[in-house]
Amino acid sequence: CTYCMAEDMQFLPKKDILSLEEIEDICRIFIKLGTRKIRLTGGEPLVRKGIMQVINNLGEEVGNYLDELTITTNGSQLEFKAEELYNAGVRRINVSLDHLDPDKFREITRWGDLEKVKRGLDKAREVGLKIKINTVAISNFNQNHLAEILRWCGKENFDMTIIEVMPMGDIGGDKR
């Protein structure tokens, strides 16, 4: 989204990014140290090739050494991954959604297919995932629509968290 990533952001070289094995190893170390809840976030974790194997492996610990395995996602892959997530032991997801207007949604996400995300949310609910919507409050963008999102979440029986923008350095000159 525009508030997280500048248009001309330079990505790390692949060799500098944690491998899936390293991610799983770190999670297992935390579990051995007594961590009871693991949340996988991103970027967008569900587009990472091979991530479902990590989720399946960590999901084997749910009910034993792990109380909860959750995913924070932009929702773009839920339509196709929700059932697999549930079967892997995920019971709750957080979905980032900052506007209910399709054009505004596309503007903030840069890819935005709000209807695809909504279909994914429907699928997630259908398979039994508990859903929390994360909405970043952005002045001059969605501050007058937060109540609308809250009402929609209530109607859909989704939990909602309103998040304040956290300045993370230069994100392309955006003043949010």
Go through the PLM ranges and name each one.
Residues 2-69:
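Conserved alpha-helical substructure of the radical SAM core
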Residues 9-11, 45-47, 75-80, 91, ...:
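Conserved radical SAM core fold
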Residues 33-39, 65-70, 91-92, 97, ...:
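Conserved C-terminal portion of the radical SAM core fold
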Residues 77-88, 150-151:
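Short amphipathic alpha-helices and their capping/turn segments at secondary-structure boundaries
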Residues 14-18, 22, 109-113, 141:
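Alpha-helix N-cap and loop-to-helix initiation/capping positions
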Residues 23, 51, 78, 117, ...:
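Aromatic/hydrophobic pocket-lining residues that form the small-molecule binding cavity
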